[in-house]
Amino acid sequence: MKKILIIGAGAMGAAFSIPLIDNNHKVFITEPYSQRFIKNLSSKNKFHSGLKINLSKKLIFKKYGKELFLEKYDLIVIALSLSGINFVSRELKKYKVKSPVLVLTKGLKYDKKNKKITTISQTLLKNIPKLNVSVLKGPCLAKELVRKSQTSVI
């Protein structure tokens, strides 16, 4: 059983927790932008309004903060919007996180200063050069993951 932290409790982060729990991993989920959202998700029925499902009772909700990064995880999954990548990158660097990172975020970033398009993994590695980072790409929608539909990812 691996200990996995998902940062981002939106549709894809929450949906990604399902196969992880199905494979008997200990899964934690947090939301840096909305404590109210994570509080609602951690209620008795664990209803996710975006996915229209009750999440697993085995899913463990954590308040976002410094204490979160003091724990050791076998994997950290980033499921934030593109705008959250720089924020979480600074947090991972600040707390000297050594866990491998899996990015679910779609998109490319435009570096205005260098007038260059970069991938999300390049953005993370720019801030944390020795970070062990992988990226999961679709086509795979959160609702397909919830329904356990066959999809393809690379």
Please give the residue ranges for each predicted region:
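NAD(P)+-binding Rossmann beta1-loop-alpha1 motif at the extreme N-terminus of oxidoreductases
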Residues: 1-54, 59-64, 70, 111
